[in-house]
Amino acid sequence: MPIRSTTAALLLAATAAAGLTAAAALPASASTSPAGYYKLLIRVATDAPVMCLQPADPAGGAGTAVVQQPCAAVQAQNWAPLSISGTSYRFLNQASGLCMDVAGGAASGTPADQWPCNSISNERWSWPHSFPDSFWPIRSQVAGSTSYCLDVPGASTQAGLGVQIYRCNNTAAQAWAIAGPVT
């Protein structure tokens, strides 16, 4: 089966399991954010489970790690892409009301966490594709650099593992799907 067909089948199965509906792709533009909340999905290998991002403690505050967990129909796994400009977004968590953030400077291994939404580069992410779409890197814009991508350490399938930024390397550990919108 071609890669795109496999990808489409995977997204359809994951969105159904997580309580999402299929939606037409919306073009990303400088002035428009896609409406609603979406799931940020990762699958590090063809035989690996699909995982979704959420705060480690959905009731946790600023500084709570962003981790991968099995996808479920819970608000903690819902993220609204908020347009900044062009292909730059902040990802706002529905349960916490906080944005996905890089906990420090631009260096491989820097953990992702959540923080009150603001205009600093630690919360800027590049997604130059339509919503929903599948299996592309989400690039951090911390410190003005786009050399670091959202990454699952060691391409692990461990539930509860914190995600990080890591130098972009075109591996499955950095291939994200954005599925939704959530209903």
Region roles according to the model:
Residues 60-80, 107-120, 124-126, 157-171:
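Short, tandemly repeated low-complexity microdomains enriched for cysteine and small residues
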